[in-house]
Amino acid sequence: MPEKPTEDARFYGRRKGKPLRATRQRLLDTMLPALTLPLAGLGEGERLDPRGLFPRPVDQLWLEIGFGGGEHLVAQAAAHPEVGLIGSEVFAYGVGKALSQIDETGVDNIRLWPEDVRQVLPALPDGCLQRLFVLFPDPWPKRRHARRRMIQPARLDDFARLLADGGELRVASDDMGYVRWTLMHVTAHPAFRWTAQGPTDWRERPADWVETRYEAKALQAGRKPAYLIFRRRPRAADPGTLAEAPAGEGADNNP
């Protein structure tokens, strides 16, 4: 059984870095308020209605946690105008960069949360997501920092609640320790199935997977990322069957 570290409720990571350009600061001041999720207006126990977040009806709702500079988020929004995307990122520089791309491309199917994503997850209704992305998160490589990693048993419970049956959890990392951690915890969770059938399924970027800035840096440094796709099992499935179902590819092909 994978270890279950107690989750650290505090936030760790940078919120601010080098000073923002004047144009990006202007976007933070003027554009961000209109795109920010309206969590402040929710009562206790109340949840957002995804249908009311976007200017037109959307067929699916996707969430990206820690979108970095927004390359993947904005590219997916442009490629899938029928999908509503929510992006969460606490680093002000990344939020400003994403706003610049949103402004340049004119996409209108993105909503943002520039704070801790743990404030968003309880406000979303059950089964509302068809895809959930955790791409190149901080690996927190030291053992004593394991509680700070995004992939945790309690967080996977949140993801399982939010993903619709058959929905996808997509995780990417160039840190093999984090990849093994992810596989250990996600495949141990009864709600998820790893979709890989062979090593090429996780060693090669899927065709619809947009390269991020962090991924490009990893490749330039000679680090080979892993691309993991997990599928949300049907809620109506027999629990005994879930426990016995294969997690994905054979052990010989694992990272």
UniProtKB/Swiss-Prot annotation:
Annotated Gene3D superfamilies: Vaccinia Virus protein VP39
Molecular function in Gene Ontology: tRNA (guanine(46)-N7)-methyltransferase activity
Pathway linked to the protein = tRNA modification; N(7)-methylguanine-tRNA biosynthesis
Per its UniProt record, what InterPro entries does this chain match?
A: SAM-dependent_MTases_sf (IPR029063), tRNA_(Gua-N-7)_MeTrfase_Trmb (IPR003358), tRNA_methyltr_TrmB_bact (IPR055361)
Q: Which UniProt keywords apply?
A: Methyltransferase, S-adenosyl-L-methionine, Transferase, tRNA processing
Q: Which PANTHER family match?
A: 3-DEOXY-D-MANNO-OCTULOSONIC-ACID TRANSFERASE/TRNA GUANINE-N 7 - -METHYLTRANSFERASE, PENTACOTRIPEPTIDE-REPEAT REGION OF PRORP DOMAIN-CONTAINING PROTEIN
Protein's UniProt name:
tRNA (guanine-N(7)-)-methyltransferase
- Can you name the source organism? Rhodospirillum rubrum (strain ATCC 11170 / ATH 1.1.1 / DSM 467 / LMG 4362 / NCIMB 8255 / S1)
